[in-house]
Amino acid sequence: MTTYIARRLLILPIIVVGVTMLIFALLSMLTPYERASLYVSDVPKRQGSMEAIIEKYGLDDPVYVQYWHWMVGRRDADTGEIRGGVLRGELGFSTTVGGPVLEVLSRRIPATAELAIWAAVPMIGLGILLGVLSAVHHNRLIDQVLRVFSIVGWSIPTFVFGLIVLMIFYARLGWFPPGRLSDWASQIVQSDTYRVYTRMHTFDALLNMQFDVFLDALKHLVLPITTLAYLNWAYLLRVTRSSMLDVLRQEYLTTARAKGLFERVVIMRHALPNALIPIITVGGLILVGLLNGVVITETIFNYPGMGSFLAHAALTLDAISVLGVALVSSLILVVGNLAVDVMYGFVDPRIRLQ
């Protein structure tokens, strides 16, 4: 297992480089003048003409040279200093928010992670529990009802369901506002006496014993959590039900019942563990998707996460920000897939990772 994990970690940089090279190559399909127009807002006014911009940033260099400069930095012709470079911790300047990309992501990633964590609790819990319940009561009333709910949830587009709950619970009832915090809670969070531990407001509020801020942050999370949890819960329920039905037909469960084991023991100790492989696969991919930022959901609810940042960056042609998000997303995806593969070995000893 240790050798397998080490080997996968060694592959991680190769995958990240491959993803960023692909995006960089797509960006390089634009002419130097077109690319200069994308970055012109990053350049001080004294730079002048487009030719000066192209010369300063080497936009007419070969693609591999430009990629190398993006990774390790580029020496400034005037000062001789090396500027930029992903390996030096500099992802460039974001014109979308007017600040360094790394600084923006340091605020956006915790926000997206907080949303993903809270959405994963009902999604995974209800998805697996109700999926097992549906399979155990196959073709009975409860199975039919759960199947209808799962089909409805899986078929409704995210933006439609999000707008529906937003109109009902915010526009009409005024219960759960969009955004991340109320104005009064933001003032408390930004005060000198408030200590920031994780940049996740719900967890930081608990650590600061600010329970009113915790409730306010949680209230702002209700609608995006509901949207993400229901839509993904529906798919996870269907996968769990299908996997459990396959396992429940196996003869070893008949043998377990013949030995006098309670049905609950048969289901939880013998059936469910053997049905977890596809559940872990789907659940892991869904969770990785949530951590990468859910663009539509964050945009609908005005939630300042990585997904909404990516949407705004794409709309404003902020290529540097898009590259930064792609770099982080590829890291999350590779590490998430590694975690899923490792969980296979713990759940099912028959799987040997060699």
Predicted features, each with a name:
Residues 12, 74, 112, 116, ...:
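Short alpha-helical functional segments enriched in proximate histidine and acidic residues
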